[in-house]
A protein has these predicted regions:
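Structural motif
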Residues: 37-39, 57, 101-103
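Conserved short histidine dyad/triad with adjacent acidic residue
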Residues: 38-54, 88
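A short, N-terminal "cap"/entry segment at the start of jelly-roll beta-barrel domains
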Residues: 1-40
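Short acidic-glycine-tyrosine-enriched beta hairpin
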Residues: 73-88
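Ligand-binding loop in jelly-roll beta-barrel domains
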Residues: 88-114
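Short strand-coil-strand connectors
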Residues: 70-74, 97
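Short, conserved beta-strand element in jelly-roll/cupin
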Residues: 43-44, 53-69
Length: 116
């Protein structure tokens, strides 16, 4: 794969696998492209929540809105321009605030095969 620039318009968002919440994801780079990482966008509707144990290392960049990420009694809240790192094996709960959120993410290795 050659160098590329992406925008949210390039992402084909779909409901996050295995989640009941109104959270959508869209991979732009993944295992189909031959690289070691997944890059994509996530959209969280207002007031949504998901809990999972991270199957991969995940870097989430908040582009719009606000999210709170909780683990082991600690909570961080991130807004536009802020980054949350969630290491593999960490049990997290991600909650969107009343305005919802748009994020970009990078995972290592690819997250989709790790969830199957």
């Amino acid at each position: 794969m050659k160098m590329r620039k992406f925008t949210i318009a390039d992402a084909s968002l779909e409901r996050s696998p295995g989640q009941e919440a109104d959270i959508s994801v869209g991979n732009l780079v993944d295992e189909r492209h031959g690289g070691p990482i997944t890059i994509g966008y996530g959209r969280y509707a207002p007031g949504q929540s998901l809990s999972e144990t991270m199957a991969v290392d995940d870097v989430m960049i908040v582009l719009e809105g606000r999210l709170s990420v909780s683990t082991d009694g600690e909570t961080v809240t991130a807004g536009p321009g802020e980054i949350v790192y969630m290491p593999k094996g960490e049990a997290v709960t991600i909650r969107s605030h009343e305005e919802g959120a748009l994020t970009a993410y990078v995972t290592y290795p690819h997250w989709r095969p790790a969830h199957t």
